[in-house]
Amino acid sequence: MNRNTTTNKNANLNNSRNANAPGEAGHQNKTGLIYWTNPSKSGASFAATLVSLLILRNVNVISVLLKIGYMVLFTSFAVELSTKVLFDKGVVSRFGMQESPDLVGVLKPHIDRELDRLPALEDRIRKLVFAHRTRNNFTIGVSLYFLHGLFAIFSMNTVLIMTTIFLYTVPLIYDRKQARIDRAIDRMKDLVIHRFHKNYNKVVEKTEPYIDKIIPPQTDEGSYSTSISNENKSSTSQRNKSGLSSSEFDNMNDTSASKSGKDSYSTSQYNRAEYPVSQNENIGTLKSGKQEIPTEKDFNNRHENFSKPDVKTYDPRTVDIEEELAAHQRELEQNLKDGDYNLVGSKEIPDPITVPAPTRHTTKPAESQSIPIKNNETLHKTTHGLKQKLQHA
């Protein structure tokens, strides 16, 4: 009576526990040795595996097998020889096994069954190696990396013993406490993600120097847009610091850009050896240096302050370009009338390097013609070419 009452109480208690924790009912229709559905078989296989691994760890199996082999051979040899000497017939050859066991018939079904599974295994390996699913490729690659580190630290036998213990314990614990373990894993995952987002800026600041060392910043044409955006940001910050308006700051930038443009054009033209020449002058003669050299007095009279030509820059937002060009054209025509040959390579004006300085004539000079000037850059290019000619001469 009392025994039945105690049994019923235990059964009700177990049912209430299973109702409160439905995810921890146990086994959940899973069968196999590792889930201990049959404790006797699972315990026997677990014990046999551990004992065999311990034997392999403490005993040299190859040495034992070789010792057993030569002992069997020496024993059969001694018995066969002694019986032939004493009885004229060998006992071992007479009463020994006359036919070999049919190992092929026993092993062939098992081998065929395993070979039938081989094509599917080959297909899975092929898809894994050639990354048909990158997630599986990455997951198994990480697993192999950790296994490599594990085998580098521990011996193979130790790893096998640890694997056997985990194989027979971890699935059973997870099967019985699945809901609780899943909640703990989700909590840890959320905590890691929260900490990562919280410390994201610190991680970026600490890793940025190392990333710059591994991947240096681009300096080629591909980084042109990035450099332009950075330049715009720096100019904006500079304008805000100086307290200038946008129009005043743009005028300052245009002036500095025109100055730098002169220097860069002069350097590039000199490096490429592109010198403007007159129509009747050969470029080979100019590069060989055989042309007539003008005197220093003639050079000073014609080209004062030649190293820094007075070339104005224009802002199209504040200056009328056509009016300025007309004024420059009138100024150049007046200089040409006065004898200041400031252009090289034109059809109307001779080259001052190949033609000597003009002498005074009593005859009436020919009527001068106006030379069209496209823009102020023409004057700068021609005067710079004359300077390079004189330097090479």
From Swiss-Prot:
Domain Reticulon: 30-236
Composition-biased stretches (Polar residues): 220-285, 365-376
Ranges of Low complexity composition bias in the record: 1-21
Listed transmembrane segments: 61-81, 150-170
Predominant place of localization: endoplasmic reticulum
InterPro entries on file: Reticulon (IPR003388)
Keywords, in A-Z order: Endoplasmic reticulum, Glycoprotein, Membrane, Phosphoprotein, Transmembrane, Transmembrane helix
Pfam families in the cross-refs: Reticulon (PF02453)
A GO CC term assigned to this protein in UniProt: endoplasmic reticulum tubular network
Subcellular location field: Endoplasmic reticulum membrane
Glycan attachment points: N137
Topology versus the membrane: Multi-pass membrane protein
Positions where Phosphoserine occurs in the chain: S278
Basic and acidic residues composition-biased segments: 289-313
Region of interest (Disordered), residue spans: 1-25, 214-313, 339-393
Segments on the Cytoplasmic face: 1-60, 171-393
GO biological process assignments: endoplasmic reticulum inheritance; endoplasmic reticulum tubular network maintenance; endoplasmic reticulum tubular network organization; ER-dependent peroxisome organization; response to endoplasmic reticulum stress
Biased composition (Basic residues): 381-393
Residue ranges annotated as Lumenal topological domain: 82-149
Full protein name: Reticulon-like protein 2
